[in-house]
Structure formats: C-alpha cells, structure tokens
Amino acid sequence: MKLMLIGLLCLSFPFTAAAINVGTLTFAMDQDRSFTAKRVLNNNRSARLYQVSIRAIDRPGEREVRSRPADGELLFAPRQLTLQAGQAEYYKFFYRGPQDNRERYYRVSFREVPTRLFEPGPRRGAGVNLEPIVVMDTILVVRPRQVNFAYRLDTQRGTLTNTGNTYFKFLLKPGCNSTDEEGVTEYLRPGDTVTHAGIRLKGQKFIIYNDKFISVDRSCLD
C-alpha cells in the first residue's frame, strides 16, 4: 500500500490509516469485460471529498515507468464525489483501449480531502484541528482482450513460470493440511518466475486466476 499524508496534520494527530477504505489494492478487468467498479468507503467521522487520478505504467514495481494514458483509453466516473461519515459509493472505470494481446496496468490514485478545507476561513477554527489529505494508490490490471493463460511448473528445480500473457497469483501451502494463512502468495506477471524450496516438496499448490483456484500439484491426493 502506498499511503501518503500531505501536510495539514491536526495538532492531536487523530488520523488512522483506515480513514479511506478501497478494498483490495489490486483489482482486474477480465478479458471479456470493458467495465469494472471500485467501492470507496469513508471511515472517518466527518464528510470527505474523493477524487481520482490515473497513470499508465509499464509494470507494477519500484522501477515502474509512468505515462499519461491515451485520450479515451481509460475513462472513469464520477469526476469526484462527496461521502458522509460511514457512507460508501462506487467509482466506475471504462476501458476503450486496444483490443490486442497485451496486458495493461494503471496506477489509480484515490485522493481523500476533508470537506472542511473548502469552508470559509472563520468556520475552520483558525487552523486548529486540521485533518490530513490522504492519497491511496491501487493497481488496475486490464487483462488482454486476446488472453493466453499458461504456466510452467518445475518441481525438480522448485520454480513456477508465467508463460502466458496475463497475471495470476500463486498460493503455496506447506504440507497437505495447512491453512491459507500459513501459505505464501506471489503475484506473477507475464514472464515472471518464482523460485521456492517448497515447490519441490509435497504440499498444496494453487494458481488463482479469474477468481478460481486451480490445483497444480496432486501430491496431496496420492
């Protein structure tokens, strides 16, 4: 999670990281969809204004290259919204870009602004108890319109490679009776390889793709 406080902290620092809630920080638009939505929840005790900004990125990560999406490629609505305390609403995203075999990634930033910052100066209480502006980054993955889901598992070398053109999650659970919480989860983008000693061992191994759990190791069934 990338969470930034932009000045204007109140003197008593009542801020908590749970003030803005957008659910999972990575969300996807499936290959047969041109629309998705993201729920925004105001967990504060007072009203907030929400705004969205979007940047195209080559690949998520510390060295990602950001650029402005082509005009009309990814649209969203509403332009901004105001939520009262405890209220939730959806931002809608519409993909109008190329219909090809390339996966696309967008960094979607949600900006939360206290509505009192827009009130006349005297009503703000002379600058005391100002609240923070918060920006939370998420990743929107638009799967290729011509999708190829494929992988290569090598239990001898302890590797799993994404040989397709769309991302998936890999869940590795030690042994045959462990819980999901005891497992290790990795995101694999096209071309990525994960190496883990547990892949060589008997255990539960799943690929999570399009909200489906796909078992890639039958060792626990023998």
Regions found by a protein language model. Give the residues of each.
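Sec-dependent signal peptide recognition
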Residues: M1-L8
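N-terminal signal peptide c-region/cleavage motif recognized by signal peptidases
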Residues: S12-A17
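Beta-sheet-dominated interaction scaffolds and their linkers
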Residues: A18-N44, Q80, R145-L153, T185-L188
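Intrinsic-disorder/low-complexity, polar/charged segments enriched in Ser/Thr/Lys/Arg/Asp/Glu/Gln
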Residues: R33-A37, A88-Y90, V135-D137, T155-R157, ...
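Asparagine-centered strand-capping/turn motif at beta-strand->loop junctions
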Residues: K38-N44, G158-T166
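Short acidic, flexible loop segments centered on an aromatic residue
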Residues: R45-P69, R111, N165-E181
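Intrinsically disordered, low-complexity Pro/Gly/Ser/Thr-rich segments with frequent PxxP/GP/PP motifs
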Residues: V65-Q99, S178-G203
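Terminal connector regions
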Residues: R96-V147, K202-D222
